[in-house]
Curated annotation (Swiss-Prot):
Residues 824-1430 are annotated as: Sufficient for basal bodies localization. It is found in: Cytoplasm, Cytoskeleton, Cilium basal body. The gene is nphp4. The keyword Disulfide bond does not apply. GO terms for biological process: negative regulation of canonical Wnt signaling pathway; protein localization to ciliary transition zone. One of its GO terms (cellular component) is ciliary basal body. Belongs to the NPHP4 family. Residues 828-857 are annotated as: Disordered. Involved in the organization of apical junctions. Required for building functional cilia. Involved in the organization of the subapical actin network in multiciliated epithelial cells. Seems to recruit int to basal bodies of motile cilia which subsequently interacts with actin-modifying proteins such as daam1. May down-regulate the canonical Wnt pathway and promote the Wnt-PCP pathway. Acts as a negative regulator of the hippo pathway. This is Nephrocystin-4.
Amino acid sequence: MKDWENIFSQSHIIPPHKQRCKHAPSEKAGYQICIETLEGTPFRQGVLERSVEVSCQLRMTLFDSTYHHFFGRTWKSSTKPIKAIPGKASKILFNEPIYFYTTLIDPSIMAVIEVVALSKKQGGSKQELSCGFGIMSLFSHQLEDDSSIQSGRLKLYYGTPRSLLHPTLKDPNELNQHMTLIENTCIQYSVRPHKVLPTVAHLFPENVLVSGSETIPGIMPSCDNSGDALKKPHVQKTVICYLDQICLFLYPTLEKFEEELTMLVNSDWLPKDDGNINGGSVSIQERRLHIGVHNGWVFVQKPQIVVVVPEAEMMRGHSTTSLKKKNIAQQKLSSTVQALVLRSRIRLPEMVNHHGFALVFLLEYVFSIPNGIHSKTPSAASSTSYMHMIRWASWTPSMEQGSADVALPLQGGPHHNPSNNLVYKMPPANMSSEEVQQVESGTVHFTFCAGSENQLEKTRDFAETTSKELIQSKKNVKMSNSKLVPETTFSPLESQVGPALSISQLTTSPRYPAISHSSKTAMQYIPSQLLPSPMAYQLSHAELPYASSITHLEADMSESHPNNSNGEHLQELLFSPVHAPIVAMGTQTGSTTSLLSRASLARLHSVEFPEILDCNNEVAEVVDPSNPVNFNLQREEADYLLCNEIVLQFLAFTRIHDGSTIWPESIFFTFQFYRFHHVTTPRLQLLQLESSDIATADPLTHVLVQINKDGSIKKGSPGFQIKYSVDPGFLKPGERKWFLRFLALQTLQIDIWDGESLLLIGSAAVEMKHLLRQGRTAVQVSHDLEVITTEYEQDLMVMSGDTAKQGTAKPIGVHTIIKGRLHMRMGNVGRPPEKKLKRRETLPPSNSRIITMHDGRTGFHGGSMLSNKSMNWKQSVCQAHKLADLDSELAAMLCSRMKEVSIAYQQTNSETDTTERRKKERMMAVRQQESQENANLRKSLIMAQHEERTQHTRDLQIIEAYRERTKPECISSMLNQAITSNYTVYATLGTAEFFEFELKNPYNIQYTVTIEIDSTDLRVITDTREWKHFKELTSTVTPIEENMFHVQPNTVIPQLYLRAKETVYIPFKYQTFCVDHTPMLQGPDAESLRKHSQLSQYKSNAMSSRRIKVSFKTSDGKLIAILQVNIEPQPHVVDQTFRFYHPELTFLKKSIRLPPWYTLPGAPVGTPGGEPDLQVRCSDINIICDSKKMGPGEPQDVFIKVAGGPSPQIKRFFIALYIDPWLAAPIQIWQIYVHSLKRVDVSCITGQLTQLSLVLRGTQVVRKVRAYSSHPEELKVDPDGVFVLPPNGIQDLHIGVRPQKAGSQFIYLNLVDVDQHQLVASWLVCVSCRKPVISKAFEIALPVGGEKGCNKRISYRNPYPTKKTYSLYTNRSDLLQFKENYFEVAAGETYSIGLRFAPSQTRGQEEILIFINDREDKNEETFCVKVRYE
């Protein structure tokens, strides 16, 4: 520990000027300054007199001439004796290297060198005397590499460097005007870049001048005799450390400590004449603990920031195993002496086994201060956060010990500390002994483990014993209240791997999380796409872990029992973005195991759904979805049934029981399979399953049936079926294996919509790997898919019982609710192709990533004019075409062509008018008869024939000229085919496709070849590191050459030098982020599906092929090779889907949080160099997308900013996430929908009706419309039925909002054309609801279990002198019903309100509000009934 303290005490540095820190820093650059010799004698006469020993020392400090500011740390050289030889110039040899790195690359940054004489007088006293100084310009010349050296002689001036701070010295270059130059004296020096130094920049501060011989913990000592460890620095090996069971105790108790702290902050911040302002005061908002590894110089990595909470709050939020073991006496003690505890386990991968490394703890408090404190106009709408450091501690671990339980005293006061901030005062030291002083400052306790988490698990076995010993040791200390330190022991299941998060840092689930269903106790690892919430399992009053809200600071990832309680909402971290991060719930497929009873399954399968038959008319083989799938690509490709007929059958839908939900009568689905068109099914009616036995009837399961135009049920088999025929005629050459890979890896995402209101019910996803036939003729699989919806809302946080307190955070909560289960069947029927395929004369595209210039893929064969479709000339057929049909320019010049066009035009017109044609025929007959009689007319006919022949001759001349002009182009095109190579790339969104082209110089002289590409998606890899990375990924064995390409300035066209007959390999990379962003229409598309009687005839969507041409040209313009890359787009994986509803014509700003990178699917294990940086790319260039790293070991945020369009426009785009620095393949792809809606803001009180009107504008035609709400129990519309919207008219739509809970939520309102089932208008109703004033409170206890409820009565007295009529409402209609919803009470009389409470099967506690409203529906009184189910 002393080693760290000694190093830390000597590491004081001065930061750069504050104005300089505001500038955007550039990249870090390392430098080496070598001080070689001091020539001459800079000492004045008489200085050395009466000195016994005189030595010389050089000192160097960085200086900012712009702001006249010294910064960094003063470097001191070793002392050298001064030996004056008469008649000979003095020369002192130093040869000392100095190292530093900086981001302030500016000519005004200089180094000031001072010459100091150290003398020892005869009396033994020592003296230091400044003899001169010089200024070294560091960045006046640009140094590019390590071989660039800036050397020179530094002139010295008399005086001290303090003279640079004199106000008259504006420019250091003007020293000659103010200072005296020391003649015949200089310092020889050199400056060179040191590019290896930034690799160890995390071990010492920026702008600090250090010698290579100085001790920097973390850098290995030099292996040679020079002792220069920074010349070729090497980092010491790191050890992963874990901290668990962290708790902090403050003296005398946490409550009294924070009370005194708050009082002092109040007196400091609030006005002196008043203790508060507008009823507000300074309060504690959050308690943070910074934990990091410090090497005496700097934190090796940015400290991890976690939030610690008082033990009492944690006990209210989580019932842990260890806390249950406490006896009654200990519980009484813990109510007085509390600790700040952290449930998370901290992982520190940057620790080094060195005595200079220490663990540093910084306790920081965040205070909420009203904005109006220091202003004349106080604001009541917001508050300001203010942070202050309270305590800190440091500890050097012993790696040989492995694991230990550690207790450290906390430090405070105005002393130097790692945070470089002022720390809260310490208790007076003159009042207590040394032992008591350590306790009075506070202590931090934790369990330490180095190397492996297994050691930490072993240490936990002794946690309880250790805690008892800790309590016993505290008994020996005399405290003012004589209370014991509480026991804080945690079970292994409570600790979460990784640091804790603030509420604004919600975690997202990985692609394959482990989730537990309410009906099962075992954990199921499900590769899913919609993560269900435990809130969906109808435990109405049970306190669930991370169920109804994920806004808690730390999600308990290990909880699996639904009877544990939720933790309280904590406050948001300071400086978090305004758009608080939301959780990426993940597009997770739900359970495929049926939850229906056997009786319901029997009734469901008794319905005559269409069977899936194979090519022999036999029922397809049934596959169990729970069985694993062994994918064998060779077996699939060897199947003789080349046609795959994919069958999707939507059979039934099961609702989730919810008494307050009004379910639709019809639904429809939207999805997209492979690269077929996006499908929107027609509306499907929900019909309840019939049963003769009422006891076994299932009122929740409904069969899907098709509907006719008039609304009647269509005859035929129930359900809805779609077939996709994927045959060799549909697939392109080489695409078959990509389609099989699509089935093996992809999931089909299905959105379920309300057929009447066009509101989204939820989404489901199903894996398609079971459709792989693996040699079988046909397979089928049945799925019961969870239909899940995700809601984002703000929960009202109550801090310290003050609901109106300023500065309370309102984090966005994420709720997932299971809306039902979709029963569907999928099948794959193998069939022989309809047309017999001809024998291929050419081989399919090769899988090799190396393309040669002459390997059979070239497009020209021996000068033949034929195409390359067939090598058999006898079978080649060429069809002649008119030249005028091939060239529009030629057709415009030909007279005969114009006549044909005229005749065709005349014929077209004559066909439209029969009478006019007859008149023209009679006129032509009359003229012909007259011409025969008249000789002059005969001559005119001869002249006409001659003119026609002249025109034909002219046309032939034009055609000849055209042929001569196009002949060079045609010959050049045919010759280019001889040097053209073709390559096919099957590309997906965001995935880089790598290949190499073997280029050979066919000439006997050297050339500089220019590579021209006609697409920006394809580029040449010019970075050797990127080239090597892709060769390792693709296992390509070809040579790599450094600095192979040259790119001219201001261009992106690479050039390559080729020797005569030389062959090289050119690396290419194709990557695109452009996809079709056209979203589906929000409505059932029945008409388009009726046009396709055979649904298997669906054509491919807009994923069209394209070609990219790469030309290799010499310096004189000759083509030596052409590469034609054929791009075949393939469907991409969609890992998660987000659907946001946002006000129209505004910017949507969202922040989505990712978990730590190593938990993501596909993340590499054991990546060297620490955590990779997350990079994101968006498919829409008009959308701003970026990522932000929160700190070591913490997740990262993805920020998006989208410009919304007019209502009801839907915008769709994709985001690709990478942890690979070269963006080889995305680890996740997100699909995001943004619905633009008209915004309506409503402010109301819980239980009270708030009414307002919306203006409806009619369209061009008359429409029959109806308004639908997403929360019909909270938002009512008037008129509530179908009404007529006149054309171009204006009409009011009245809405009434009655929220059932306090907080902020979003309600969607759609106006739908009931005839066309089209969306006419849509609104986003933003409800901000506050709690009512509770007039009376009641508490009852009800037994758990049973089928009957419980009846109770509450008395209400009419306080008015007149008779009154009241109405009753409740926020929990599923738990409470009234005997009468309306009642009358005479003046001054009392009425007994009859209540009936519903039975419950689970334990818990619920608060039910009873609203008593008057005739105008205004709230008269509100009763609160707290129900305990025991």
